[in-house]
């Protein structure tokens, strides 16, 4: 560790939970922000706030050693641990900004017809494939996306990985997939031209235009098009390695087109990223000179590495958070920061037909949960603030989610997030940092009494156990 490493190192601690390399690298490497988006993209970029210190040129982060990547072919993986690495090495049609909205990547602009059933993507003309050493190996055109799409929806080639989005949304993609299933081993000989002849709703009018025809109007297709199902693949590389070879290509064999390359990789130990010298976005985006990911056995080790200045950030265990937050003079009290929310929602799902251990129906619970007033007591009276604090001790109520999905999953054509539309329809208030939205200005005493009266009348006894 040299002096420059020490001086330029910003210090911050993350609250709790696991953070993926994809979000960290992409945010600074260009995969999550871009210019050149069209009106239909609704894109907006947010520059990083300065803390007054020298910017980091090298970034040292971590990952759990049980989340090591297992695939180098992004088309043949559905594992987030793989995507955390691979989406920094390979770009697709679109990416997303820090708010989850699609922004330009290899497609520099896009639009759709009036009913959003046909989407046209206009590709950059300066995107190249390169090998692991940064040597240019080919030029990317619309053909590479045809090859990639055919690979994904060909059951023999990609073994059904990443098929759900194209099969659900693209015209005749499901029929073509079923066709490859029927062909069996013979599907290995199919090419993208066979896919086009079959009538699958994807075409390339020229080298830098790609058109998708959806089964039905699909106003959110730009959010779909950024997924790995629609990433490009090189026909030359597939022919060079063969189907099995490409499917299970190694780090040294694969070709790349993203903002970073892997400089060094030691399985379940470390991996380091360096800028891809051939990346099309090099002049428009800032990138770290190096990113090193250390694989950790546990958070205790990670905290020690942070204290030794060997990591720039680390997630904390609940006990460590408590220790720091309970001591305003703690050396790390001013280094705590909140984690960016992930696009997952956690929910209560009631069992309306519960059985006892002996196999008999749990009538007491089943009657209670069938009562609307009983369920509303849960909805309007359950304050989970202390539970949220186990994840976010700084602002626990930032964890509250009163919707079926999380923010950033989808939005309307005006750029308004789906959860905001639901919030308005339900009459929910906004986050205030003090009280849960569901329990705000609500006195459930009358509701509780109503539930108890109604349940007592049908023989329910209290307390109700589940």
Residue ranges of model-derived segments:
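Bacterial lipoprotein signal-peptidase II cleavage site
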Residues: 29-40
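Acidic glycine-/aspartate-rich tracts in secreted/extracellular proteins
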Residues: 67, 126-127, 217-218
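N-terminal low-complexity, Pro/Thr/Ser-rich intrinsically disordered segments
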Residues: 41-59
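N-terminal lobe/hinge region of extracytoplasmic solute-binding protein
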Residues: 61-114, 255-256
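Extracytoplasmic/periplasmic ligand-capture domains
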Residues: 7-8, 28, 98, 124-158, ...
């Amino acid at each position: 560790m040299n002096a420059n490493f020490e001086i330029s190192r910003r210090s911050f601690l993350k609250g709790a939970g696991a953070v993926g390399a994809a979000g960290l690298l992409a945010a600074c490497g260009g995969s999550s922000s871009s210019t050149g988006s069209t009106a239909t993209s609704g894109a907006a970029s947010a520059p990083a706030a300065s803390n007054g210190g020298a910017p980091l040129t090298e970034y040292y982060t971590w990952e759990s050693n049980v989340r090591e990547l297992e695939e180098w072919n992004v088309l043949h993986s559905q594992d987030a641990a793989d995507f955390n690495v691979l989406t920094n090495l390979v770009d697709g049609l679109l990416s997303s900004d820090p708010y989850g909205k699609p922004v330009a990547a290899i497609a520099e602009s896009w639009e759709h017809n009036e009913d959003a059933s046909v989407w046209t993507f206009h590709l950059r003309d300066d995107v190249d494939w390169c090998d692991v050493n940064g040597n240019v190996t080919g030029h990317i055109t619309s053909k590479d996306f045809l090859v990639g799409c055919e690979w994904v929806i060909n059951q023999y080639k990609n073994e059904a990985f990443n098929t759900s989005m194209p099969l659900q949304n693209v015209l005749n993609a499901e029929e073509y997939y079923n066709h490859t299933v029927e062909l069996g081993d013979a599907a290995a000989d199919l090419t993208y031209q066979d896919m086009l002849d079959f009538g699958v709703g994807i075409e390339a009018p020229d080298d830098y235009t790609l058109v998708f025809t959806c089964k039905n109007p699909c106003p959110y297709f730009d959010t779909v098009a950024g997924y790995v199902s629609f990433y490009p693949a090189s026909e030359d590389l597939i022919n060079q390695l063969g189907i099995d070879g490409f499917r299970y290509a190694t780090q040294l064999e694969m070709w790349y087109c993203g903002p970073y390359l892997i400089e060094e990789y030691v399985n379940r130990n470390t991996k380091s990223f360096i800028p891809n010298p051939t990346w099309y976005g090099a002049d428009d985006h800032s990138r770290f000179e190096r990113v090193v990911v250390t694989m950790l056995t546990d958070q205790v080790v990670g905290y020690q590495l942070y204290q030794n200045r060997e990591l720039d950030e680390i997630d904390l265990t609940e006990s460590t958070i408590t220790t720091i937050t309970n001591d305003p003079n703690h050396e790390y009290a001013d280094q705590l920061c909140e984690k960016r929310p992930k696009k997952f929602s956690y929910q209560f799902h009631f069992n309306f037909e519960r059985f006892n251990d002996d196999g008999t129906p749990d009538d007491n619970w089943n009657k209670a949960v069938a009562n609307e007033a009983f369920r509303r007591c849960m909805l309007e009276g359950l304050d989970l603030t202390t539970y949220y604090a186990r994840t976010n001790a700084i602002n626990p109520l930032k964890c509250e989610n009163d919707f079926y999905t999380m923010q950033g999953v989808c939005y309307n054509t005006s750029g308004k997030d789906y959860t905001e539309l639901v919030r308005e329809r339900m009459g929910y208030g906004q986050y205030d940092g003090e009280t849960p939205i569901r329990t705000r200005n609500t006195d459930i005493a009358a509701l509780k009494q109503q539930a108890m009266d109604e349940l007592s009348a049908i023989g329910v006894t209290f307390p109700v156990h589940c």
